[in-house]
Amino acid sequence: MSELPLFPLQTVLMPDGLLALRVFEPRYVDMVARCMRGANRFGVVAIREGAEVGAATTYDYGTSAEIVDWHQEPGSLLGILAVGREPFHLLTTRREQDGLYVGSVEWLEHVPSPKLAPAHEPLAALLKRLVESVPMYQNVAAPLDDAAWVAGRLVELLPFSLELKQSLLETRDPLARLERIAAALEPRQTG
């Protein structure tokens, strides 16, 4: 069990995914500074109820994030780029005096990523087209034969509901995740 500072957001971060944030609240600016000084990570958890500013109820599963780049923006904004690392189960949370949430987390066991099955090649082709239109992925190697990587990027880039994205994060098997993505896309492709 570990403790992580938490960043509740209206999004789901998958392992190996990229997340660009504009940070302005003092509690998160301080958290980012601490993470960068100590090479520590923070946890990204999707908001079930509430808002990003103020109190929020989160889902019980999230992903640790490592800051890989940052820049100062006008108006006291801090821009950061983080990459998703390990998924976790959020056991308990507490709110610090400055409003920052800290969670006790249990790291989820690593699931080896199989090669992409031939049946999922159309999903890899779709992802290739999507990634080409997303600037932050322009300089990222795209292992389109890696089932977990393909599934993770599709979860992030496709316009699925937050609830479905969260459920896909909680689906541990990459091939099962791809099957669920294909099923979710099916009505759109035939309609």
Regions found by a protein language model. Give the residues of each.
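N-terminal low-complexity, acidic/polar interaction/targeting segments
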Residues: M1-G191
